[in-house]
From Swiss-Prot:
CDD domains on file: cytidine_deaminase (cd01283)
Catalytic site positions: 58
Residues recorded with modification Phosphothreonine: 27
Region annotated Required for interaction with RNF126, chain positions: 88-116
Residue span of region Important for interaction with CTNNBL1: 39-42
Organism: Bos taurus
CC per GO annotation: cytoplasm; nucleus; P-body
Listed name of the protein: Single-stranded DNA cytosine deaminase
InterPro entries from the UniProt entry: APOBEC/CMP_deaminase_Zn-bd, APOBEC_Cyt_Deaminase, APOBEC_N, CMP_dCMP_dom, Cytidine_deaminase-like
Family: Belongs to the cytidine and deoxycytidylate deaminase family.
Post-translational events: Ser-38 is the major site whereas Thr-27 is the minor site of phosphorylation. Phosphorylation regulates its class-switch recombination activity.
Listed Pfam families: APOBEC_N
Length: 199
């Protein structure tokens, strides 16, 4: 586990949602774990991780939370803020992990979409697999960056300032993510329509 708070410069560099993210070869993950008790929730832990040699950050988090003694009678919500969306293999591992913990829900807010093999189209399929497993996936917006800045960054009481293009890139990436997940949304919409009609 890294130190509790990230350095400002490191956060801004690693999480910046630029179109061409050259030199950003690691994934950083900020997380919040909450236990849900009726309509209220109780924070259990928060922090951040990054890739270690030979192990992606998503798998590091799964190892970390696997050591917890999660009460099967309680509901838990995990929220990730990631610099890159998960690769296909990590998405598969996360979906499989969640299958074993039906009382744990996951939300992922990502700065950028990761695609390492454009010919294979594996990463988009990994995102669809996560969505089918019940994971809420979204692109980080100003509100998410602001939250991360105030929760995970050693900000010395400086206010978060958006960089040029933050909003436009969030919109562009959100549209791209929507196109990736669109077939699943259409199936969900059809399912809801049939349910409404009683079919």
């Amino acid at each position: 586990m890294d130190s509790l708070l990230k350095k400002q410069r490191q956060f801004l560099y690693q999480f910046k949602n630029v179109r061409w993210a050259k030199g950003r070869h690691e994934t950083y993950l900020c997380y919040v774990v909450k236990r849900r008790d009726s309509p209220t929730s109780f924070s259990l832990d928060f922090g951040h991780l990054r890739n270690k040699a030979g192990c992606h950050v998503e798998l590091l988090f799964l190892r970390y939370i696997s050591d917890w003694d999660l009460d099967p009678g309680r509901c838990y919500r995990v929220t990730w803020f990631t610099s890159w969306s998960p690769c296909y293999d990590c998405a598969r591992h996360v979906a499989d992990f969640l299958r074993g913990y039906p009382n744990l829900s996951l939300r992922i807010f990502t700065a950028r979409l990761y695609f390492c093999d454009k010919e294979r189209k594996a990463e988009p399929e990994g995102l669809r697999r996560l969505h089918r497993a019940g994971v809420q996936i979204a692109i980080m917006t100003f509100k998410d960056y602001f939250y991360c800045w105030n929760t995970f960054v050693e900000n010395h009481e400086r206010t978060f300032k958006a960089w040029e293009g933050l909003h436009e890139n969030s919109v562009r990436l959100s549209r791209q993510l929507r196109r990736i997940l669109l077939p699943l949304y259409e199936v969900d919409d059809l399912r809801d329509a049939f349910r409404t009609l009683g079919l």
